């Protein structure tokens, strides 16, 4: 099972749009996650705890980033964006294993940029 959490123990049910970039030599990369109207912004969630990061959890363990921000429209939070930095080929492989599980469970597909 592959899940994303912003507050530990509370799974985000809104599926993210994920954009990936990778350096030419494959040693580094960036994954940008965008959640439109995520559960974490819904009324009553502030009682569950603070957003301390984005946690990518699966059977292998946990990946985490603290680079999480809210996007506001007319003074109201509408989206959450999180950026996960990949610093080595090993981290890239681990991240891709998580994404394969997350994609399969949420019926996502991969489209390569032209």
From Swiss-Prot:
Organism: Gracilaria tenuistipitata var. liui (Red alga)
Protein name: Photosystem II reaction center Psb28 protein
Location in the cell: Plastid, Chloroplast thylakoid membrane
Family of this protein: Belongs to the Psb28 family.
InterPro entries, per database record: Psb28_c1_sf, PSII_Psb28_class-1
Main location group: plastid
Membrane-topology descriptor: Peripheral membrane protein
HAMAP family: PSII_Psb28 (MF_01370)
GO cellular component: chloroplast thylakoid membrane; photosystem II
């Amino acid at each position: 099972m592959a899940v994303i959490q912003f507050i530990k123990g509370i799974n985000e049910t809104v599926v993210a749009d994920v954009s990936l970039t990778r350096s030419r030599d494959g040693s580094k990369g960036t994954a940008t996650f965008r959640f439109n109207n995520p559960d974490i912004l819904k009324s009553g969630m502030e009682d569950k705890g603070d957003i301390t990061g984005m946690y990518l959890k699966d059977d292998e363990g946990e990946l985490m980033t603290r680079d999480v921000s809210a996007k506001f429209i007319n003074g109201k939070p509408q989206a959450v964006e999180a950026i996960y930095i990949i610093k080595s080929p090993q981290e890239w492989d681990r991240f891709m294993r998580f994404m394969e599980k997350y994609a399969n469970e949420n019926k996502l597909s991969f489209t390569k940029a032209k």
